[in-house]
Amino acid sequence: HGQKNGLMTEMGYNWRMPQLSAILGRYQLKRLDGFIERRNEIASKYAEAFKDIKEIELIKVPSYITHGYWKYPILLKKYTAKEFQTLLKEKYNIDTGTVYYPPVHLQPYYKENYGYEEGMMPSSEKNLIREICLPIFVDITDEQLNYVIESVKAELS
C-alpha cells in the first residue's frame, strides 16, 4: 500500500505480518546477536580495506554504538551511484543497492501534499546521488567479500 514502482504515491503501508513470517522472526531473534556480530565483522573488513581510498567516503559510527549494519553505504566521489552500480554489475557481476532514492522529500506523495521540490534539501540530494550500498549479509563468504573489496579497489584506487 502506498508504493508504485518503488515511489511513495500515497501515505500508508500494510504492516500486517503473515503468521509464517512471525514464526520465522521469533526463531531468528534467537540468532540476532550472531547476525549483528557477523555484519559488524563484514563492515570492519570493508572499512579497513577502503580507509585509504580517497574516492570513497565511509560512514562514521561512534565507538559507543553497536551498529546493526542493515546496509553498508559508501559515498562515491568519482562516480554517481547509478554509474558505479552499472559498472560493478556489468564488469564484476556484483549487485549493489541504495538506502533510499529518491530522497523522501522528492517522493511524489511529499511533493504533491507538502510542496517539497528539488533543491530544498541539497545535502540529501547531493549525498543520495553518490551513495551505494555494498553487499552485506550474514551468509556472504570471505571469498565473496574479498571479491567485492578487490573489485571496488580496482576501480577506485
Regions found by a protein language model. Give the residues of each.
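PLP-dependent aminotransferase class I/II
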Residues: 1-157
